[in-house]
Swiss-Prot record:
BP-aspect Gene Ontology terms: trans-translation
Region ranges (Disordered): 121-151
Designated gene of the protein: smpB
Organism: Chromobacterium violaceum (strain ATCC 12472 / DSM 30191 / JCM 1249 / CCUG 213 / NBRC 12614 / NCIMB 9131 / NCTC 9757 / MK)
Name of the protein in question: SsrA-binding protein
MF terms (GO), sorted A to Z: RNA binding
Annotated Pfam families: SmpB
């Protein structure tokens, strides 16, 4: 079950490969995510200190959060991946033009997981081509539906 999706990532990037990774979260963050108070729009994944980190993911703390904990809504969150997955993605990220994006957050067996994708940026003409293709697919579906109804 998906909690939130990063639709902007699919609009601005070609997603070439996907991977599910765990997240290191604090208790108030899990409660806020379950309440749907999370935003992935400006988030990306960065390589630091031998691990991948989710940067820019905004988790708004609940009003009922504990007073002795100082919540930081945009703190970097460590991604939990196997060493083989890390090695495979490091080689691809170090190539020119590739980046890693958080595509969505979802539950797997009660745990919050992030779907991370290896992405390459789209140019303006690529975005236009994608929009034309979507529009054409919609038009085809509309015509097929009308023809089925008329027959």
């Amino acid at each position: 079950m998906s909690i939130i999706q990063n639709r902007k990532a699919f609009h601005d990037y070609f997603i070439e490969e996907k991977l599910e990774a765990g997240l290191v979260l604090e208790g108030w963050e899990v409660k806020a995510i379950r309440a749907g108070r999370v935003q992935l729009k400006e988030s990306y994944v960065d390589w630091k200190n031998g691990a991948f980190w989710l940067i820019g993911c905004h988790i708004t703390p609940l009003q009922s959060a504990s007073t002795h904990v100082k919540p930081d809504p945009v703190r970097p969150r460590k991604l939990l991946m196997s060493q083989a997955e890390i090695n495979r993605f490091i080689g691809k990220v170090e190539r020119a033009g590739y980046t890693m994006m958080a595509l969505d957050l979802h539950y797997t067996k009660g745990n919050v997981k992030a779907e991370v994708g290896l992405a390459k940026g789209k140019k303006l003409h690529d975005k236009r081509d994608t929009e034309k293709d979507r529009e054409w697919q919609r038009e085809k579906q509309r015509v097929m539906k009308n023809q089925r109804g008329a027959a």
